């Protein structure tokens, strides 16, 4: 993709507030984080190829941000395009970077490993090279609980062994190792690696949410698509686990809580020289697949027909986080419960049954909600 093409969302205002580059800022977690950054007073520049995300997400962020949308701009650029990225860094002095850009479908990573190493590892290397060349040495990196593989015990702390099971998880671990090596070579760097568990939910307005291209790779969008009639049933992979109801247990976290975690991480970066450190972002609670389905049925009033399938190879029985380190050092804690996650997911789904491609999307484009 040609780099450096600027899509004007709103004219960025000059000011003394800190300026943050958000790669992948049109994506699911990225767009929610951009909105929270604007609300917190940051100037935000989004760099996104728009290959697996929608420009409409950024336009809706601008609408939701109101007056603060003047502090938002979007560059349509692929982070693997070094020349395009150089132009972005030459146009603005960044105080820090929040790096979301990448591919995230576990199944696809098994089928197309080179594609994942190219986007998630080579792309990160190019970003780090350009950051270093421009003297920007503060980074919040979007990692994943996938770096842990299938831990034998939960809650999972940051000290657990890093044994990812698939190419996606390995790309995240390699990018983490690169960040650690950079810090050891140059202590001016401050890097926070955020390992997310299972992000779900949507902005309470119902105008920002997850818009997966093709087949979703996690539970909640599948539940959502069944509820709005796009799929006939939900397949549960395994109901014979040693859990309370036989289905797998995961740590689901509201995307707004996750976005707030990024703001807290950025503040930590600006406060002190942190080195290179990893933090889990989760609720610290495990919820089963059936509990999610029941909560979604309750808030939506829709029945979710279930099909029981075999276990998927490599799926952990129980995986939930200890987020004690982030709570202690960031003063951050997830606030939303499962019912609120499902409520906001359903609000988004019912307003946007086909994601950002919904027929009335254009009407919602330029208005505050």
Swiss-Prot record:
Q: Which one GO biological process term can you cite for this protein?
A: galactose metabolic process
List ligand-binding residues for NAD(+).
Answer: 19-50
Cite the entry's keywords alphabetically.
Answer: Carbohydrate metabolism, Galactose metabolism, Isomerase, NAD
Q: Where is the signal peptide?
A: none
Q: Which family does it belong to?
A: Belongs to the NAD(P)-dependent epimerase/dehydratase family.
Pathway(s) of this molecule: Carbohydrate metabolism; galactose metabolism
Return the protein name: UDP-glucose 4-epimerase 4
Q: E.C. number, please?
A: 5.1.3.2
Q: Could you tell me the superkingdom of the organism this chain comes from?
A: Eukaryota
Binding, substrate: 144
Its biological function? Catalyzes the interconversion between UDP-glucose and UDP-galactose.
Cofactor(s) needed by this chain: NAD(+)
**Enzyme class at the top of the EC tree:** isomerase
Q: A GO CC term?
A: cytosol
Catalytic positions are 168
Q: Which GO terms describe its molecular function?
A: UDP-glucose 4-epimerase activity
Instruction: Indicate whether Cytoplasm appears among the record's keywords.
Output: no
Is Secreted included in the keywords of this UniProt record? no
